[in-house]
Amino acid sequence: MSNSPQNKREAILEAAFTQFSRYGFRRTSMEDIAKETGISRASIYSHFDNKEEVFRSLSAFLHDRALGEAEVRLKGTESSIKAPLQVSDRIASALLAKINPFHKVLTESAHGSELADENSQRCGDLVRDSQERFQSMLTQTLTSAARDGEIDLKTAKLKASAAAELIYLGASGLKQGASDSATLEKRVRNFVRVFLDGMI
C-alpha cells in the first residue's frame, strides 16, 4: 500500500466496501475493516472517527467514482470505443455506470437491503447531490445532441433539463425487480432507445 494519505484512505474504503457487503453495516466493526485493509485499528482511526464516518465516506467515494465513469461514457471517450457512438448508446452506458454499481450491491450482497436502508438514512444528502450532478451532465449532453441535430427536443415539447430528469428517474425505476446486471442493462438500453425515438 502506498504511504500517500489519499491512497491509504481509499484502501480503507475499499476494504470497508468488502466488509459491509460481506457482513452488513451493523455487524461490521472497525476492527474488521482494519484487518481487511491490513493495518492497525489505530491507523483506521487516524483517518475516520467512527464506522458511521467510514460509511458516509464510502458512499461519497462510490458516487464520485460512478459519476466520473458516467461522464466518460457520456462523452464517448472510453479507450475501447473505435467509432463515435450514437447519443442513445452514450446515455444508456452512462446511466448504467451511474446506477449499476449500487444495484449490484443490492442484488449480489446478502445484506443489500440493509445497506440500501442505511445509505438512505445516513447518506440521503449525498444521494441527492449525486443525482443532481448526473442530471446536470445529462442535460448538457442532450443540449449538445439537440444542437448537433441528433435529437429534436421541440418534437417532445421538453426542455433538456426536463428530459434529463425523466430519463434518470425512469431508468432508476427499472432497477425494481431486476435480478441481475444483465437484466438491468437490457431494460435501460431499451428504455433509452424508446425515449429518444420520440425526439427524432
Question: What do the PLM-derived regions correspond to, one by one?
Answer:
Residues 1-7, 77:
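N-terminal intrinsically disordered/low-complexity leader segments
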Residues 8-16, 33, 58-62, 66-70, ...:
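Generic hydrophobic, amphipathic alpha-helix propensity
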Residues 11, 15, 19, 23-53, ...:
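Helix-turn-helix
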Residues 13, 88, 92, 96, ...:
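An amphipathic alpha-helix signature
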Residues 22-26, 105, 148-149:
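Short coil/turn segments at alpha/beta junctions that flank glycine-rich nucleotide-binding fingerprints
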Residues 57, 71-104, 164:
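Hydrophobic alpha-helical connector segments
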Residues 89, 93-139:
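Short secondary-structure transition hinges
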Residues 109-113, 117, 124, 128, ...:
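Hydrophobic/aromatic-rich alpha-helical bundle segments in the mid-to-C-terminal region
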